[in-house]
C-alpha cells in the first residue's frame, strides 16, 4: 500500500547511501512557507540572485549531460496548500533530491523551487561565484563526487556568446536597440501556456502605454566604446553604491540577453603581485572596459565591476534602487517597433471589377445622403404589428384562441367530469397514502380563502403529485369541475413530463386526457375544463405574453420555488402584479426547503402551511468513514488539505471506487450518484464501464442531465430486470425535481455547478462550488423514499458545518440581459431597474444597468429603454439576445439555415465530449472545420453530415458516422428539435413565409447559405461587440518580452483562447479578426471556447455603430468609432465606396425589420438580391493572412 511518509523516508535513506557527501541543508523556504502563507524574504532574495532559475537549472543539466532539455531530470509536482500553491521539485541529477517552493500561482511556486535548487547547485560547486556555467569536462569531474554514472556524459560544443551582442555596433548600445531580439528567450520562454497565462500578460500596445507614463528617467544613449580607469577613490565610492557588483552585472546581462550565464559577456583579467590590477571587459550593451586595483584579486575585480555598474546606471540600464530592469525594458526599441507595426492599418485592395459593380449598384439604388439608421423605437402608428401574439388571447391550457365557455357548456362539462370521477374509484384506491393526504382540507380551504398560499413540504410528502389532484377532486365533486384549470410549473423539462405522467397514471384511464404537459420541443396539452397542465417556467412566461391576465386559468402552482432559479423569481414578479388583473386566480407556491417566511412576506403575509414528510432511516457516511471503508487511509490527509482551503476538486476515481464498493458489499437496490456536471457524469460513466468490462450487462448505468432528451431518460424511472443493478449518475436535477423510487444508496459529491457573473470583467463563469446544507438534506432524502437507505457524503463532517444554509438566488449571480428583455416584453412601460426592484431579492442595480447597456449596444433597446424594431423581432425567438439577433440578420441576409444550426449547437453541444476525449473531439472539430477557421462551421458540417446519413444510410452507417465524428445522438435529436422550434419562432416574427422555408435549401432565406464568409460575417454581426483582434507579441507580469507569442484583444481587454477552439493551435490565420459567443472566467483568466475567423470587410460592413474616415484625397483610413480593433486603409475611392455600401446594407436591414420580410415588394426584393450578391462576391476576396509566429508551447 502506498504511503507518502514511507516513500519520503525510503527516498531519504536511498540518498544517504547513494552520496558520500552529507545531504545539503535546505534553506528555510524550501521546507515551509511563512506562517501566513506568504513567501519569505529569503525566497525573494533567492529570486534576485537567480532571476531565471528554471532556465539556469535546464542549462546546467543540459551542459553537463549534452542534452537539449532536462525535462526528465527535473520533475515538478504540484500540490494545493492552505493558501498557496506548493511545488515539489524532484531533481534526478547529479543525485536525487527534493526541494519545495510556494507561490500564489503555480508558476511562482515553480520558480521558488527552482531558485532553491539553484542555491543547492551553487553550494555543490555546480555554478560559479557569478552563477556562471562550467564546461562539460569540469562537470564530469564534479559528477564523480556524487556517484553519477559516467556513461551518460558526452562532450558538447563550447557555448559561444550570443552573436547579436558580440557584434554590437557602438552606435546601438541604447537598451532595446537592434539585436535585442535575435536570440530566443530560452527554455523559460517555452513554459506551458496555461501556466504562463496564470502569471498574467499584457500586449505590446498596453505595455508601451504604461512605459510612457512611467516616472523613470528615459534611457540614455552612449556613443562608441569606452575605456574607464578612474582613481581609487571613485572605485571605492562605486563599490559603496553597489556592494555586490558582480552579482548585479550578471543579473542585468542574464535578464537583458535571456541567457543562463553572463560569463561570456563579462570577462576579468587580473595581473600583479602585491597590488592587483583587474581589467573587466564588458561586451554588453557594447564593448566597454573598466580597470581598478586592489590588494587582493577579489577586491580589484569588485571595484572594476562596481565601476561597470555605475556606467550602466548612467545609461539607464539599472533602476533607481540599483536593481536590473525587466527584459521588456531592455528591449524597448523592439517593442516600440512591434507596437508601431500593430498600429498600422490593414491595407485593403478590392478588385476593380467589383468596385465598378458597387458603383453601378449605388448609382442605380442611391442611398440618400440624409439617410441615417434611425433609433427603431416601438411606435404603434408606424410599425407593423409583429408576431401572432398581438392577436386574440390564447388559451393558456390548450394554446388555441381563448373563448370563455358558455354557461350551458360549462354545466354539461362539469357533469361529465363528475361521472368520470365516480367511475375511477378502484384506481384511486391503488394510490398509496401520502403524508399530505391528512392535510387536504386545511390546504384546500387555505387556497380557497387566500389568493396566495405557501406550502412547505418535506421530501416525500407528496405535494407535487397530490395537491393538483386534490384541487381537481374538490372542484369536480362540487359540480364545478369545468372551472378548474390548473397550471403547475416545474423548474426542469424532465420533472414536468415525469410528474404529468405520474399524475395521469394515478387519475386513471377515464381522466388521463385531463392531464398534460408542455415543455420545450415536446407538448401534449390536456383538454380544457378540469385540466392539469404541467410545464416549465419558461413555457408559462411565453403564455403570459399572449394572455397577460391568464384568463381561463383557476390556479397557478409554482413548484420547487425554493430553488430560486432566475425564471421562477421573474415569474413571481409577474404573478404578484397579476393579482390586480385577475383577482380570482389562486396562486400556490410549493417548497421543499428554504426560507418560506420570505415568500410569505413577499406576498403580503400570506399563510404558510407546513406538511411533514415521511422518510425511512438513512445511515450517513462521511469522507473519513468512506476512505476507511475503501482502505484509502493515506488519502485522508490530502483531502483534509483540500478541506482547509475550500477547494472544490472532485476525485472521479474515488467516486468510481465507492460505487464499485457499494455494488460489491452494499445492500441490493439502485445507486444514485450526485455529480456537478456533464463532464463528471461522462467521466464516471466511462470509468465504470471500463471497470465492469464484460460484466457490464449486469448493470444499468443511466446518466441524467438536461442535455439528454426526455425519450432517452425514461429508463431511470423503470425497475431494472432481476439481477441488474441500476446506477444513476445525475446533477442536482435529481434532488427534488424527479423521484426514482428504487434508490437505496446515494453518493453525494457535495458539489454542483453554479453560474456567477463578474461585473468587472462582464463575463460569466460556471464554477464548481459546494452545495448548501439544504441541498445535502435533499440528497440524503433520496435514499429513504421507499425503504431504509444509505448516504455517502464525499466530504468530511466538518465541511457540512461550513456550508451555507441555502443557495444564493440565481438572479443575484447571473447576467441579466435575457431577464431585461423579458421585462420589456411583459411590461414595456417600466424601466428595467424599476421592474427588477420588485423581485424577492433585487439584483445589483449596476448589473441591471450593464444588461441595459448591452441591449442598447446590440440595438435591441433604444436610449429610453423601449424595444426597437429589431428588439420586437428578437422577442419571438427563445434564445440569448445576441444569438436571436444573428438569426434575424441571417433571415435578412438569406443564409438562415446554417445560422439556425450554429445557434442550436451553441445551446446544446453535439459532440460526445468528456474529460478523457477532449483532445480527440478537438481534432474532429478541426477536420470538420476544414480551412474555414471556424468552430461554428464545424457544427454546421457535423449536423449536415448527420442529416445526410439519416436521409440515405442504414443504421450501421449512422452509428459509424457518430463514432467517427464523436457525435452524441441524443444531442443531435435535441438540436433538430431546436431548429424546428426556431423555425416556428422566425415564422411568428414574420421573417419567413412558412416555417419549412427555414431548412429548405431552395428557399430565398437560404440563397447564400453556402457562402461561408457571409455566414461567419452575419454571425459576427449578431454577436458584436464580441470581436477579437489577434496581436503579435506580449509582455509577462515578470516583464519578459515574448515577441513570438500572440495576444487576443477585445474591446474590453485581453482574453485567452481555450484549447477547445481550433484557432488556438492555428499557425496561420486567414484573418486577424475572430468572433465568439461566450467568454468564461476560470482561475482568474477569461477564456473563449468557440471562435470563427471573420473577413475584415465583414467587420467593417456588417457591424452596428458609426465609422470614422480620414481622407487626404489619395489614401484614406476607415475605422470603427467605438473601438480600436479595426483600422483599414485603401485608396480614397475604395474607402468611399465601401462606406456607401455599408450604408446600403444598413438601409436593407432597416427596411426588412419594418415590414413583413416575405411580403416586401418585388422591386425591393430585387434590390436586396443584387446587394447581397455584391457582398458575397466581395467577401470571397482575400482577408489579408496573418502568420502566428508562436513559440513551441504557445
Swiss-Prot record:
One of its GO terms (cellular component) is nucleus. Residues 53-121 form the DRBM domain. PROSITE patterns: DEAH_ATP_HELICASE (PS00690), HELICASE_ATP_BIND_1 (PS51192), HELICASE_CTER (PS51194). A motif (DEAH box) lies at residues 559-562. Signal peptide: none annotated. SMART domains: DEXDc, HA2, HELICc. The modification Phosphoserine is found at residues 6, 226, 380. It is linked to Neurodevelopmental disorder with variable motor and language impairment: An autosomal dominant neurodevelopmental disorder characterized by global developmental delay, intellectual disability, speech impairment and gait abnormalities. Belongs to the DEAD box helicase family. DEAH subfamily. RNA-dependent helicase. Plays an important role in the assembly of the mitochondrial large ribosomal subunit. Required for optimal function of the zinc-finger antiviral protein ZC3HAV1. Associates with mitochondrial DNA. Involved in nervous system development and differentiation through its involvement in the up-regulation of a number of genes which are required for neurogenesis, including GSC, NCAM1, neurogenin, and NEUROD. This is ATP-dependent RNA helicase DHX30.
Amino acid at each position: 500500500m502506498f504511503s507518502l511518509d514511507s516513500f519520503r523516508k525510503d527516498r531519504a535513506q536511498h540518498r544517504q547511501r547513494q552520496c558520500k557527501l552529507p545531504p545539503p541543508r535546505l534553506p528555510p523556504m524550501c521546507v515551509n512557507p511563512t506562517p501566513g502563507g506568504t513567501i519569505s524574504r529569503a525566497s525573494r532574495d533567492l529570486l534576485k540572485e537567480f532571476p531565471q532559475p528554471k532556465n539556469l537549472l535546464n542549462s546546467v543539466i543540459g551542459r553537463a549531460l549534452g542534452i537539449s532539455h532536462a525535462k526528465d531530470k527535473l520533475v515538478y509536482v504540484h500540490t494545493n496548500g492552505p493558501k498557496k500553491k506548493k511545488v515539489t521539485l524532484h531533481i534526478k541529477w547529479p543525485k536525487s533530491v527534493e526541494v519545495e517552493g510556494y507561490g500564489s500561482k503555480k508558476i511562482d511556486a515553480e520558480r521558488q523551487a527552482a531558485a532553491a535548487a539553484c542555491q543547492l547547485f551553487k553550494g555543490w560547486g555546480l555554478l560559479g561565484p557569478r552563477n556562471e556555467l562550467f564546461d562539460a569536462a569540469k562537470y564530469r569531474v564534479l559528477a564523480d563526487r556524487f556517484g553519477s554514472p559516467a556513461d551518460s556524459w558526452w562532450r558538447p560544443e563550447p557555448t559561444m556568446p550570443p552573436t547579436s551582442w558580440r557584434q554590437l555596433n557602438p552606435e546601438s548600445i541604447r537598451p532595446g536597440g537592434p539585436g535585442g531580439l535575435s536570440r530566443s528567450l530560452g527554455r523559460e520562454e517555452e513554459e506551458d501556456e496555461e501556466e504562463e497565462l496564470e502569471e498574467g500578460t499584457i500586449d505590446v500596445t498596453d505595455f508601451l502605454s504604461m512605459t510612457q507614463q512611467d516616472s523613470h528617467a528615459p534611457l540614455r544613449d552612449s556613443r562608441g566604446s569606452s575605456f574607464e580607469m578612474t582613481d581609487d577613490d571613485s572605485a571605492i565610492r562605486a563599490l559603496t553604491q553597489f556592494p555586490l557588483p558582480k552579482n548585479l552585472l550578471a543579473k542585468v546581462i542574464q535578464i537583458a540577453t535571456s541567457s543562463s550565464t553572463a560569463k561570456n559577456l563579462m570577462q576579468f583579467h587580473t595581473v600583479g603581485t602585491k597590488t592587483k590590477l583587474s581589467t573587466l571587459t564588458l561586451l554588453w550593451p557594447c564593448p566597454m572596459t573598466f580597470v581598478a586595483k586592489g590588494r587582493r584579486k577579489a577586491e580589484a575585480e569588485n571595484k572594476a565591476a562596481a565601476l561597470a555598474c555605475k556606467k550602466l546606471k548612467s545609461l539607464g540600464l539599472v533602476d533607481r534602487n540599483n536593481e536590473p530592469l525587466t527584459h521588456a525594458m531592455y528591449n524597448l526599441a523592439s517593442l516600440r517597433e512591434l507596437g508601431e507595426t500593430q498600429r498600422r492599418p490593414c491595407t485593403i485592395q478590392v478588385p476593380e471589377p467589383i468596385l465598378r459593380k458597387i458603383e453601378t449598384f449605388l448609382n442605380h439604388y442611391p442611398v440618400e445622403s440624409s439617410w441615417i439608421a434611425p433609433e427603431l423605437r416601438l411606435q404603434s402608428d408606424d410599425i407593423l404589428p409583429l408576431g401572432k401574439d398581438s392577436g386574440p388571447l390564447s388559451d393558456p391550457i390548450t394554446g388555441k384562441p381563448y373563448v370563455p365557455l358558455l354557461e350551458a357548456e360549462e354545466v354539461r362539462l362539469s357533469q361529465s367530469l363528475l361521472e368520470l370521477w365516480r367511475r375511477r374509484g378502484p384506481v384511486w384506491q391503488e394510490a398509496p397514502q401520502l403524508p399530505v393526504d391528512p392535510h387536504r382540507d386545511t390546504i384546500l380551504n387555505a387556497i380557497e380563502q387566500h389568493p396566495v398560499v405557501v406550502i412547505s413540504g418535506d421530501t416525500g410528502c407528496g405535494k407535487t403529485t397530490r395537491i393538483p389532484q386534490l384541487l381537481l377532486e374538490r372542484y369536480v365533486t362540487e359540480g364545478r369541475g369545468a372551472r378548474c384549470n390548473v397550471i403547475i410549473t416545474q423548474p426542469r423539462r424532465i420533472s414536468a413530463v415525469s410528474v404529468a405522467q405520474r399524475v395521469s397514471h394515478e387519475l386513471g384511464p377515464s381522466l388521463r386526457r385531463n392531464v398534460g404537459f408542455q415543455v420545450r420541443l415536446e407538448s401534449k396539452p390536456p383538454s380544457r375544463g378540469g385540466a392539469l397542465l404541467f410545464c416549465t417556467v419558461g413555457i408559462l412566461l411565453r403564455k403570459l405574453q399572449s394572455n397577460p391576465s391568464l384568463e381561463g386559468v383557476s390556479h397557478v402552482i409554482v413548484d420547487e420555488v425554493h430553488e430560486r432559479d432566475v425564471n421562477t423569481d421573474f415569474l413571481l414578479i409577474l404573478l404578484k402584479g397579476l393579482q390586480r388583473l385577475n383577482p380570482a386566480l389562486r396562486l400556490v407556491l410549493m417548497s421543499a426547503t428554504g426560507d418560506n417566511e420570505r415568500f410569505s412576506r413577499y406576498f403580503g403575509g400570506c399563510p404558510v402551511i407546513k406538511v411533514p414528510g415521511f422518510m425511512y432511516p438513512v445511515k450517513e457516511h462521511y469522507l473519513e468513514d468512506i476512505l476507511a471503508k475503501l482502505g484509502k487511509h493515506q488519502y485522508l490527509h490530502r483531502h483534509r488539505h483540500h478541506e482547509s482551503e475550500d477547494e472544490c476538486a472532485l476525485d472521479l476515481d474515488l467516486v468510481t471506487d465507492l460505487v464499485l464498493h457499494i455494488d460489491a458489499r452494499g445492500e441490493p437496490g439502485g445507486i444514485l450518484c450526485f455529480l456537478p456536471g456533464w463532464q463528471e457524469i461522462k467521466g464516471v460513466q466511462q470509468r465504470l464501464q471500463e471497470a465492469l468490462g464484460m460484466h457490464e450487462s449486469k448493470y444499468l448505468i443511466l446518466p441524467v442531465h438536461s442535455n439528454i432528451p426526455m425519450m432517452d431518460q425514461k429508463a431511470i424511472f423503470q425497475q431494472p430486470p432481476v439481477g441488474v443493478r441500476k446506477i444513476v449518475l445525475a446533477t442536482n436535477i435529481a434532488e427534488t425535481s424527479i423521484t426514482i423510487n428504487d434508490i437505496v444508496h446515494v453518493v453525494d459529491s457535495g458539489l454542483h455547478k453554479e453560474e456567477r457573473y463578474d461585473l468587472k470583467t462582464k463575463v460569466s463563469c460556471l464554477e464548481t462550488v459546494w452545495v448548501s446544507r439544504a441541498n445535502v438534506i435533499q440528497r440524503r432524502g433520496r435514499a429513504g423514499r421507499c425503504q431504509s437507505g444509505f448516504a455517502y457524503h464525499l466530504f468530511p463532517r466538518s465541511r457540512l458545518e461550513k456550508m451555507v444554509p441555502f443557495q444564493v438566488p440565481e438572479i443575484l449571480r447571473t447576467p441579466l440581459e435575457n431577464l431585461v428583455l423579458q421585462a420589456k416584453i411583459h411590461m414595456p412601460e417600466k424601466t428595467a431597474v424599476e421592474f427588477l426592484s420588485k423581485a424577492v431579492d433585487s439584483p445589483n442595480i449596476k448589473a441591471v444597468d450593464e444588461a441595459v447597456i448591452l441591449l442598447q449596444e446590440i440595438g435591441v433597446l433604444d436610449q429610453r429603454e423601449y424595444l426597437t424594431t429589431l428588439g420586437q423581432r428578437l422577442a419571438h425567438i427563445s434564445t440569448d439576445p445576441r444569438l436571436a439577433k444573428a438569426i434575424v440578420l441571417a433571415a435578412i441576409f438569406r443564409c438562415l439555415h446554417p445560422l439556425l444550426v450554429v445557434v442550436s449547437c451553441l445551446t446544446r453541444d453535439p459532440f460526445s465530449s468528456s474529460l478523457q476525449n477532449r483532445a480527440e473531439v478537438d481534432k474532429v472539430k478541426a477536420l470538420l472545420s476544414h480551412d474555414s477557421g471556424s468552430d461554428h462551421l464545424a457544427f454546421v458540417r457535423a449536423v449536415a453530415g448527420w442529416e445526410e446519413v439519416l436521409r440515405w444510410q442504414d443504421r450501421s452507417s449512422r452509428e459509424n458516422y457518430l463514432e467517427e465524428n464523436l457525435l452524441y445522438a441524443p444531442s443531435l435529436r435535441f438540436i433538430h428539435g431546436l431548429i424546428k422550434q426556431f423555425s416556428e419562432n422566425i415564422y411568428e416574427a414574420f421573417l419567413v413565409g412558412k416555417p419549412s422555408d427555414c431548412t429548405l435549401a431552395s428557399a430565398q432565406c437560404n440563397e447564400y447559405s453556402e457562402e461561408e464568409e457571409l455566414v461567419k460575417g452575419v454571425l459576427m454581426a449578431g454577436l458584436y461587440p464580441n470581436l477579437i483582434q489577434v496581436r503579435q507579441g506580449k509582455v509577462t507580469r515578470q516583464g519578459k518580452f515574448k515577441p513570438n507569442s500572440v495576444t487576443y484583444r477585445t474591446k474590453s481587454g485581453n482574453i485567452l483562447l481555450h484549447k477547445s477552439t481550433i484557432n488556438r493551435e492555428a499557425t496561420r490565420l486567414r484573418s486577424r479578426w475572430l468572433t465568439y459567443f461566450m467568454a468564461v472566467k476560470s482561475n482568474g483568466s477569461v477564456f473563449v471556447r468557440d471562435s470563427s475567423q471573420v473577413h475584415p470587410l465583414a467587420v467593417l460592413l456588417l457591424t452596428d455603430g458609426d465609422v470614422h474616415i480620414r481622407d487626404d484625397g489619395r489614401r484614406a483610413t476607415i475605422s470603427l468609432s467605438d473601438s480600436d480593433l479595426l483600422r483599414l486603409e485603401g485608396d480614397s475611392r475604395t474607402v468611399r465606396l465601401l462606406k456607401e455600401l455599408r450604408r446600403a446594407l444598413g438601409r436593407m436591414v432597416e427596411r426588412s425589420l419594418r415590414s413583413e420580410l416575405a411580403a416586401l415588394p418585388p422591386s425591393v426584393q430585387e434590390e436586396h438580391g443584387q446587394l447581397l450578391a455584391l457582398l458575397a462576391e466581395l467577401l470571397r476576396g482575400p482577408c489579408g493572412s496573418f502568420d502566428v509566429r508562436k513559440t513551441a508551447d504557445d
